């Protein structure tokens, strides 16, 4: 029942929120967000397990599929859509499925989070296989749509993870690796778009970033698979070449063009003083890891 969930309780520090000054409201919200950061830090072992599941899925050709309803689903979508431009992934590699479909991005879809059959249909629609990993996101930890999605994923042999903001979450029962961030009562009672949402976003950032590092999408701390789809990103790509190799801006531009806009290929070309084809071959042999390709 909802009344037993910590995220649904009244926060003792904000019982008189309507009587506070603007500055006092901002201060208490900032303090509560600090608590969310601490709560996430206590779940690093569990988050690490999820990252390992995701890396394993990617290595066998599988996908990462986030499933959620409301704010949780939208946060999953936010993380998913940032992966192609940041890491050069195919849009299908990291996906998000929202209860209620695309309409739920901008408005509430009545009854969507309770539709267990829709969760199964939605996963079938994207062709879920045992090679994939499904991560269910639900602040309450009990959203029927998410529970159903994880249950179905386990039935077909896919790896599963979960992210909840309450202890003893139902979704944890269907997860190979379960994260339970105890964020506690919200500034606005029950409004889990606040602390719980902040905590979920931090965890999603960790999962996608650490997983991409684990499959060679990063060299040093540079986004070497960045897709330069606009002028800002093209300049960033060239700056990465300058910083990673020590070449001049003019040389960076030349190598960038010779490497067909592929930053990691250009890095190997510069540091190994080789042509495009040899650099590509080195990267292929190194499974995409720049550091290994340079050895």
UniProtKB/Swiss-Prot annotation:
<feature type="domain" description="SIS">
    <location>
        <begin position="54"/>
        <end position="217"/>
    </location>
</feature>
<dbReference type="Pfam" id="PF22645">
    <property type="entry name" value="GKRP_SIS_N"/>
</dbReference>
<dbReference type="InterPro" id="IPR005488">
    <property type="entry name" value="Etherase_MurQ"/>
</dbReference>
<dbReference type="GO" id="GO:0097367">
    <property type="term" value="F:carbohydrate derivative binding"/>
</dbReference>
<comment type="similarity">
    <text>Belongs to the GCKR-like family. MurNAc-6-P etherase subfamily.</text>
</comment>
<dbReference type="InterPro" id="IPR046348">
    <property type="entry name" value="SIS_dom_sf"/>
</dbReference>
<dbReference type="InterPro" id="IPR005486">
    <property type="entry name" value="Glucokinase_regulatory_CS"/>
</dbReference>
<dbReference type="GO" id="GO:0016835">
    <property type="term" value="F:carbon-oxygen lyase activity"/>
</dbReference>
<comment type="subunit">
    <text>Homodimer.</text>
</comment>
<dbReference type="InterPro" id="IPR001347">
    <property type="entry name" value="SIS_dom"/>
</dbReference>
<comment type="function">
    <text>Specifically catalyzes the cleavage of the D-lactyl ether substituent of MurNAc 6-phosphate, producing GlcNAc 6-phosphate and D-lactate.</text>
</comment>
<feature type="active site" description="Proton donor">
    <location>
        <position position="82"/>
    </location>
</feature>
<dbReference type="GO" id="GO:0097173">
    <property type="term" value="P:N-acetylmuramic acid catabolic process"/>
</dbReference>
<dbReference type="GO" id="GO:0016803">
    <property type="term" value="F:ether hydrolase activity"/>
</dbReference>
<dbReference type="GO" id="GO:0009254">
    <property type="term" value="P:peptidoglycan turnover"/>
</dbReference>
<keyword id="KW-0119">Carbohydrate metabolism</keyword>
<dbReference type="GO" id="GO:0046348">
    <property type="term" value="P:amino sugar catabolic process"/>
</dbReference>
<comment type="pathway">
    <text>Amino-sugar metabolism; N-acetylmuramate degradation.</text>
</comment>
<protein>
    <recommendedName>
        <fullName>N-acetylmuramic acid 6-phosphate etherase</fullName>
        <ecNumber>4.2.1.126</ecNumber>
    </recommendedName>
</protein>
<dbReference type="InterPro" id="IPR040190">
    <property type="entry name" value="MURQ/GCKR"/>
</dbReference>
<feature type="active site">
    <location>
        <position position="113"/>
    </location>
</feature>
<keyword id="KW-0456">Lyase</keyword>
